[in-house]
Amino acid sequence: MFLGFLLTLTLGGAGILPAADEEPPPEDPLEAALRIAYEGRKRIQEAIRDYTCILTRRERVDGRQMGYETIFVKVRHPLEEQGRVVQPFSVYVRFLRPDRVKGREVIYVEGRNGGKLIVRNGGTRFAHITTSLLPDSPAAMQHTRYPITEIGVLNLTKRLIENGEQERGNENCEAKLVQGAKINGRSCTVVQVAHKVRGEGLAYKTARILIDDELVVPVHYSAYDWPQTEGGKLVLLEEYTYTDLRLNVGLTDRDFDHRNESYLFLKSYSP
């Protein structure tokens, strides 16, 4: 009798146990986005030594909407051996547009040059001036929201993970995942996170992240504030798009040296 009861439960005759082929509940969009971001961070740290790309950005700085800037970027990730840094985090950028900053070059090598940037002014006035600046100094931060030390897809991935983990369990936060988007012809997954109600300390109303499906790295991030008027449009806070990503191109110390013959820094400058 008892054995027959067990068989009834096992076969689902009593309606207690689910069918073996019943589909699991869909993954929470925020958790799915975090899972993708964790995978991306692991891939970047383990498989991507360096890369070049084009960064297109647009930001609101001190309440003022800045125009689009297009920047050629070289990044080399840090490398440690036996607990010692043998290759520091390194960045080189050259501004391509607009004209007011065209030709500006910046180099940053973590732990070198007194922790300072080496900057060639570029643009239409005093273009050839070469100087050193702290990354977070007022002069370096004059027209941007973040220091150059935070540039790149790895830093963007880390920031997305940090923000996503903070939103876990937040009932004021809605997330959704959309497949099939394209950036520069490449297939991407869209992660959108939105806050339903304005609250103190919220950095944005809506954020959109596009993750390259093949590379598993974020290639676009944009964040919007609440409308300034009832029924108005969302206000852009920041927008960053990485295109033409070329991975593991073999960047060397020379790529992050202002004396490189292909750069326009003052070669005699001593930081």
Label each region the model flagged.
Residues 60-62, 97-99, 107, 113-270:
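Gly/Pro-enriched, hydrophobic low-complexity segments
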Residues 2-13:
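Bacterial N-terminal signal peptides
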Residues 5, 47, 87, 185-187:
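A short, polar/charged loop/turn motif at coil->beta-strand junctions and beta-hairpin connectors
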Residues 31-126:
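N-terminal mature ectodomain segment of secretory-pathway/periplasmic proteins
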Residues 19-21:
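Boundary at the C-terminal end of the N-terminal hydrophobic targeting segment
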